[in-house]
């Protein structure tokens, strides 16, 4: 399918559960139609990068993406068309906070988007071994949604 198999936590489904969205850290977001397993890559609106997504959640016809692989690090709302097969607009929800040290993994509950502000990616060496002395306590953030 051409989708990065190494990032299994960066996917979400639409409300009808007929479309799966999978983020690839370098390529962007693939939309997979569940009925026929057809894969197509979403085109991003001008002004927003497709790269560096390390968290993805579907909510009210939008994808909320955590982008820790771009500068500035940010949380972006990517608005979908009604068919959920094209990105039509975007809005930066939060960015450039000094507390954002590799934000990752999010969920939406009770009208807020929750995510970790400090995933421990920098605590791993080149061989994938975790240096526990470099791991900070998790910091959970929330953004109130409309």
What are the residue ranges of the model-derived segments?
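A short beta-strand motif characteristic of beta-propeller blades
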Residues: 1-2, 38-46, 88-96
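Beta-rich, blade/repeat-based domains predominating
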Residues: 1-19, 23, 47-67, 98-110
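Surface-exposed loop/turn positions within WD40 beta-propeller blades
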Residues: 17, 26-28, 36, 70-72, ...
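Short loop/turn segments immediately following the C-termini of beta-strands
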Residues: 24-25, 68-70, 80, 118-120
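Structural signal for beta-propeller blades
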Residues: 28-30, 71-75, 122-123, 140
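Anionic-ligand binding region
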Residues: 29-31, 36-54
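Short loop/turn segments that connect beta-strands within beta-propeller blades
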Residues: 33-37, 79-84, 144-146
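Short, conserved, GDST-rich strand-edge loop motifs in beta-rich repeat architectures
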Residues: 118-137
């Amino acid at each position: 399918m051409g989708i990065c198999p190494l990032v299994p936590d960066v996917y979400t489904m639409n409300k009808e559960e007929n479309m799966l969205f999978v983020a690839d850290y370098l390529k962007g977001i693939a939309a997979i139609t569940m009925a026929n397993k057809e894969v197509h890559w979403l085109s991003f609106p001008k002004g927003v990068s497709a790269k560096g997504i390390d968290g993805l959640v579907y909510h009210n016809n939008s994808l909320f993406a955590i982008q820790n692989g771009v500068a500035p690090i940010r949380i972006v709302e990517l608005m979908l068309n009604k068919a959920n097969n094209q990105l039509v607009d975007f809005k930066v929800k939060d960015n450039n906070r000094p507390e954002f040290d590799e934000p990752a993994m999010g969920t939406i509950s009770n009208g807020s988007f929750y995510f970790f502000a400090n995933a421990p990616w920098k605590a791993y060496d080149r061989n994938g071994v975790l240096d526990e002395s470099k791991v900070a306590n998790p910091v959970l953030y929330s953004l109130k949604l409309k």
